[in-house]
Amino acid sequence: MGYRVEADRDLCQGHAMCELEAPEYFRVPKRGQVEILDPEPPEEARGVIKHAVWACPTQALSIRETGE
């Protein structure tokens, strides 16, 4: 089963905690909002992605399971 990483742009305040936790999957430009570099990352990245989602202080990130 696959998964997709999603961001709620209304909640993101650009704290960049996700980028600190998983820089290969998230980027936050100065005074910007999160950019998800790979919205459907490999299964082996799930642990680091979950940690980055957990680290978001505004809970702007989420993981959605896909049927694939």
UniProtKB/Swiss-Prot annotation:
Highest taxon of the lineage: Bacteria
Residues binding [3Fe-4S] cluster, per UniProt: 12-13, 16, 18, 56
SUPFAM superfamilies: 4Fe-4S ferredoxins
Entry keyword set: 3Fe-4S, Electron transport, Iron, Iron-sulfur, Metal-binding, Transport
InterPro entries: Fe-S_cluster_ET
Cofactor: [3Fe-4S] cluster
GO MF assignments: 3 iron, 4 sulfur cluster binding; metal ion binding
Gene3D superfamilies in alphabetical order: 3.30.70.20
Pfam families (alphabetical): Fer4_15 (PF13459)
Keyword Electron transport on entry: yes
Cofactor: how bound: Binds 1 [3Fe-4S] cluster per subunit.
More info: There is a positive driving force (of about 95 mV) for electron transfer from NADPH through the redox chain (FprA and Fdx) to CYP51. Thus, the overall process is thermodynamically favorable.
Role played: Ferredoxin that is the redox partner of cytochrome CYP51, a sterol 14alpha-demethylase encoded by an adjacent gene.
Name assigned to this protein: Ferredoxin Fdx
Organism per entry: Mycobacterium tuberculosis (strain ATCC 25618 / H37Rv)
